[in-house]
Structures are given as C-alpha cells and as structure tokens.
Amino acid sequence: MILSIESSCDDSSIAITEIKTNKLIYHKKISQELQHSIYGGVVPELAARLHVEALPKILEECKEYFPLLKAIAVTNAPGLSVTLMEGVTMAKALSISLNLPLIAVNHLKGHIYSLFIEKQEVLPITILLVSGGHTQIIEANSLNDMKVVATTIDDSFGESFDKVSKMLGLGYPGGPVVQEYSLKGDVNRFDLPIPLSQSPKIEFSYSGLKNAVRLHIEKLENSEEGIREQDKYDICASFQKTAVDHIMQKLKKQFKQKVPKNFAIVGGASANIYLRTQIDELCKKHNMNLYLSELKYCSDNAAMIGRVAVEQYKLKDFISIEEIDIQTRIKEF
C-alpha cells in the first residue's frame, strides 16, 4: 500500500491505495472553501495554517495501515509554496520514521490519473485539463511521456469563473455558483466576444472575456435600476456559454489536425456540466471514447496522487529526502 498526501492549495487530503489492485483503501479530504470564501479567494498563509491543523487529524485515522505501507507519496509541484511545504514536510517525516521510500508526484499528472482511480490506465489519451490555474490540452502516451500541445496565454478557465463570481458578489468558489445562476439566465442577452476566435493558433485566453463581463456589470451598476438578480443570472449564462464556446472552438481546430481515439477532461473545472455536455457531443461526432473523472475526484484530492504513485512505485521512481523540493510552477511534464 502507498500513503499519499495532497496539500497543493486549499484541500487537505490523505489516501491509501493498494499497489496490486489500484483499490482505494482509505481516502479523506478536508476542504477549506468556507474559510476562504469570506476573502473571495484562497489566502495562501491561511491555507497553510489550516493544513497544519487538518493533515495530522486525517493521518491519525490511518495509523492502523502503517505496518502495510510500502511507500509515502506527496504532491510537490505545482501549487502554492507554503501549502506544498506542509504536505512535503509531513511526507519526509513519515518516510524517515517508517523507513519507507518517498515518491514526489506532479499534481497535474494527478488530475490526469483521477480518470483511473481504482481502474487500469487507458493510454494513449488526449486530455483537456481545466482548473483554477490551468487550461491545457495534453497528449499522454505514458506516465512519463506527456506533452502540453496547447495552453492559456494569460488566465485560466476556472479562474475566470471565480473572477466573474467575485465581480457579481456571489462568493467563492465561483464555478458552482456561476453554473447554478446560469441555469436561470438568458445565454443570448449579453454579447460577449469569444476569445481568439480569429486566431489560427490553438491557445486559450480569458483576460479579455473577464474584462468584457466587467464592463457590462459596471454599466448595469451605474444604471437607474442598478444590477438586479435576473441581470446576474443572464451575465452568468452568457459568460459560461462564451467561456465554453472558446474551448470548443480550439478543440475543433485541434481535431482537424489529429483526432484522438481517447479523449478526457480533468481538473476542478471539469465538473462544469455545460462543458461536459458540449464535449460529449463533440466526441460522439468524431467517434472518440470520452473519459470523465467522477465528480468527487475532479477537485484536488489524495486519491489521484496515490494512483500516480502506484505507477511510479512500479518504476521504482523514488526520491531522497535531500533531493525533494517544491515547485510552484512547472514548464513541462
């Protein structure tokens, strides 16, 4: 068994995964959404302090499995430096005290392997990764052969939902609330520009779309009636459709070059139902197999880290206590 730790942002999570069967023996996550919501986003120092409180509590529940463990795995990149450090510090201490090898896991590979929790790998596969920090198209041939073929030039899909929600005073995290508000809105009321629609390049951008939404909100706020609840519904609906349309346009261009046999969407923002529906239709049109993470595994969790760690364990991909470090960003897989 492998004990895995996730603390890259605002979720404290520990899991135990069986190596031979990929079975998830134990998994628990403590979210910090409530504590950060009053600030409209994640406060790194607060997140780190909350990890200090939560991780030991979760670990206490796992002690019965310690004699069965073969390795300790931990997310070491990418993420917030102060929160990554809490997980890595715990992992190093466990590695030393239990005399077990240490496995450093790429958080983004974790999101990809969230598709395979308690399942076998399906490779090669092309993946759309959408989260608060990333919007990427990735071609994965194996665990150690992954290539980013498209990325954002500024902001991410998930971050734009958080920003729109904040501008409308709807709270954090923005993804679920914007999705909920959009159900009551008119997608055609506000004419929002689809980013990079005239560009032949396969890349993403959300800064311009966020600015366009901001201008509509300011215009409504300065009107005699002010901004009404229905206005918020309509803005959310128009924004969500445009944000997803942008992704769909770029995916269609990508598929003109190469149609993969297997396609997947992963990351916290992949829980968006409208995005899932649009991609499902596109995959059916191109006869592609579509793979989706279970909704409970879309956001950050240690189960996906453990699933990657199983494959790294088989390859004896270990790292020493002295060598492991944290990285807030990574350029390639």
Curated annotation (Swiss-Prot):
Its main location: cytoplasm. It is found in: Cytoplasm. It catalyses: L-threonylcarbamoyladenylate + adenosine(37) in tRNA = N(6)-L-threonylcarbamoyladenosine(37) in tRNA + AMP + H(+). Its EC number is 2.3.1.234. GO terms for molecular function: iron ion binding; N(6)-L-threonylcarbamoyladenine synthase activity. The keyword Transferase applies. It comes from the Bacteria. Binds 1 Fe(2+) ion per subunit. Disulfide bonds: none annotated. GO terms for biological process: tRNA threonylcarbamoyladenosine modification. Substrate binds at L129, V130, S131, G132, G133, D162, G175, N272. Fe cation binds at H107, H111, D300. Keywords: Acyltransferase, Cytoplasm, Iron, Metal-binding, Transferase, tRNA processing. PROSITE patterns: GLYCOPROTEASE. Pfam families: TsaD. One of its GO terms (cellular component) is cytoplasm. Required for the formation of a threonylcarbamoyl group on adenosine at position 37 (t(6)A37) in tRNAs that read codons beginning with adenine. Is involved in the transfer of the threonylcarbamoyl moiety of threonylcarbamoyl-AMP (TC-AMP) to the N6 group of A37, together with TsaE and TsaB. TsaD likely plays a direct catalytic role in this reaction. NCBIfam families: gcp_kae1, T6A_TsaD_YgjD. HAMAP family: TsaD (MF_01445). Belongs to the KAE1 / TsaD family. This is tRNA N6-adenosine threonylcarbamoyltransferase. It comes from Aliarcobacter butzleri (strain RM4018) (Arcobacter butzleri). The lineage of its organism: Bacteria, Pseudomonadati, Campylobacterota, Epsilonproteobacteria, Campylobacterales.
